[in-house]
Amino acid sequence: MNRRSKWLWIEPITGSRKRSNFFWACILFLGSLGFFLVGISSYFGENLIPLLSSQQILFVPQGIVMCFYGIAGLFISSYLWCTILFNVGSGYNKFDKKKGIVCLFRWGFPGINRRIFPRFLMKDIQMIKMEIQEGISPRRVLYMEIKGRQDIPLTRTGDNVNLREIEQKAAESARFLRVSIEGF
């Protein structure tokens, strides 16, 4: 939901709380928990989970490896759940014509840099860039080129946005900021 007036435009950015992230975090957690429990079951010689038989798995080569993969998967799963819990990457883009300032706000992991809040002057914005790569894994990213700085992404690099939407968003941004558009 964009909030837009003649002088102010606030565009919310979704973070890591997406259905796909919930899906993969659940799958990874359940799979790695299964691996870990089968490895532990092979050590004790009993089935801790009735559905997962560990009778033919020897502990020394296979059980240890399954425990290791299970623990590694649980660590990766906990990282995914932390990104979902803290909603890393969410925030907003705020364009204020009255003050002549562009503010980009994003949430990060807890700590000193939890709030990422760079500010730029509108007069320093040179153009809006679109990076479009087609192929097996298409990449469509919108950048803001600022004088004396690196290009700042306005869209997430992992978002699967179709070409029409990214072009429309680039046109809206360029029209509001009164800058040109470049595609590469």
UniProtKB/Swiss-Prot annotation:
- Keywords from the named record: Chloroplast, Membrane, Photosynthesis, Plastid, Thylakoid, Transmembrane, Transmembrane helix
Please name the Pfam families in this protein's record: Ycf4
Instruction: Give the residue spans that cross the bilayer.
Output: 21-43, 58-78
Q: Name one GO biological process term.
A: photosynthesis
GO CC terms of this entry: chloroplast thylakoid membrane; photosystem I
Membrane topology of this protein: Multi-pass membrane protein
Q: Which InterPro entries does the UniProt record give? A: PSI_Ycf4_assembly
What compartments host this protein?
Plastid, Chloroplast thylakoid membrane
- Report the sequence similarity comment from the record: Belongs to the Ycf4 family.
Tell me the function of this protein. Answer: Seems to be required for the assembly of the photosystem I complex.
- Spell out the PANTHER family in the cross-references: PHOTOSYSTEM I ASSEMBLY PROTEIN YCF4, PTHR33288
Protein name stated in the entry: Photosystem I assembly protein Ycf4
User: Organism source for this protein?
Assistant: Pinus thunbergii (Japanese black pine)
Encoding gene per record: ycf4
